[in-house]
């Protein structure tokens, strides 16, 4: 896939065009690939080919590859006051000294299980985080974050 595995737990590696690999637990990695998760036609064939290639590469290991894009929903949180918004829904400290770019974690946010990670700065130089939650909790979490963001003008993005 053109991606390297992280060497430390709770971190990620990235290649802007190829995606992210997150080390989420001692025996689990999550790979976030660019593109439309509900693609059809050639795009879907390309995603299937990448999954097949990874499965073949791991065939000699005690490992499995599971495609979960339908299970998870993504939310991007960015802007000048995104930490203040986050602190309204979770107790996890995301100050840069504790959660620098390249970090990932699993925690609760507004009673929802989330996997979050901090990629590098956006193209406009603003820090951001990306969250994944179960699709069944996504609307609830998005609305809670949207409510918390109103007073700060923080941007939310569903993906």
Regions found by a protein language model. Give the residues of each.
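Basic, glycine/lysine-rich polyanion-binding surfaces/domains
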Residues: 1-159
């Amino acid at each position: 896939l053109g991606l390297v595995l992280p060497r430390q737990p709770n971190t990620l590696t990235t290649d802007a065009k190829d995606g992210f690999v997150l080390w989420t637990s001692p025996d689990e990695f999550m790979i976030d690939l660019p593109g439309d998760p509900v693609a059809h036609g050639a795009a879907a064939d390309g995603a299937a080919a990448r999954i097949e290639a990874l499965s073949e590469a791991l065939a000699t290991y005690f490992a499995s590859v599971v495609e979960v894009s339908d299970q998870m929903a993504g939310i991007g949180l960015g802007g000048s006051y995104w930490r203040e918004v986050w602190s309204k829904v979770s107790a996890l400290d995301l100050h840069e000294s504790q959660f620098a770019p390249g970090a990932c974690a699993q925690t609760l946010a507004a009673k929802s299980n989330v996997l979050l990670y901090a990629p590098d700065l956006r193209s406009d130089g603003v820090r951001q985080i990306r969250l994944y939650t179960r699709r069944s909790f996504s609307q609830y979490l998005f609305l809670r974050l949207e409510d918390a963001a109103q007073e700060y003008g923080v941007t939310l993005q569903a993906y």
